[in-house]
Every structure is written in C-alpha cells, then in structure tokens.
Amino acid sequence: IIKIKADTNQGINCDLRLLEDLLAAIGDNEILHACITYGTKPLPIIIFMALNYVYKVRNNTNIETIIYGTMYSGKKNEPTIYDETALFYTNEMFMQLADAGVSDPVKKVKAMRGMLEE
C-alpha cells in the first residue's frame, strides 16, 4: 500500500502536485486499488485522471477496484461501500467511442444496456 498525501489547499498548483505524485508512484505491471472516499471535491477527479493515464500508458497496469464509502447514510452504523470501478471502464469506453468519431453514442449505450439486461 502506497499512501500519498493530498494537500487540503485547492488550486491548480496543488492539484498538479498531487497528480505528479500519483503518476510517480505508479509503474508498469501494477494492479491498482483506489479509494475516493475522503478528501476535497477535486480529489476523486484527480485520482480518475491519474488512473486513466496509467491505464493507457503504463505496461500491464490494471485498475482492479475503485471504491467510495459512506460513513453515514441516515441510519446509524450502516456504512456502505460503493464499487465505482465500472464507472471508470465506462468512461474509457466513451473515450474510445469519441476517438473513433462515433456520432451516435446513445445508440451504442442502448445496445450495451440491452446486452446487460438479457
């Protein structure tokens, strides 16, 4: 487990420093698990940016899990953990559709939903 300290100050310099630290910590042949529960509002976006980059550029680096946890959901002592990994891969799929110049992504999404509902 590698812990990277995120500055609570917000601004482009702090965001870029965190992105730099994340990218420096992730090499080739990695299996990554990320938690986006704690931190400032930009933190999950920065983590997703770093994960997107290393997924595309590093050799044999996989995003295994991205989780978000809630400590309080209106009921005492019922924390919930959400697996956001599918959201990461859905974003990757949309980036590939955009790169391919797909003009009707809604049609593709409907087709994928149909496959999942079968």
Regions found by a protein language model. Give the residues of each.
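Gly/Ser/Thr-rich loops at beta-strand to alpha-helix junctions
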Residues: I36-M49
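Long, low-complexity, Lys/Arg-enriched
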Residues: I1-I31, I46, N52-E118
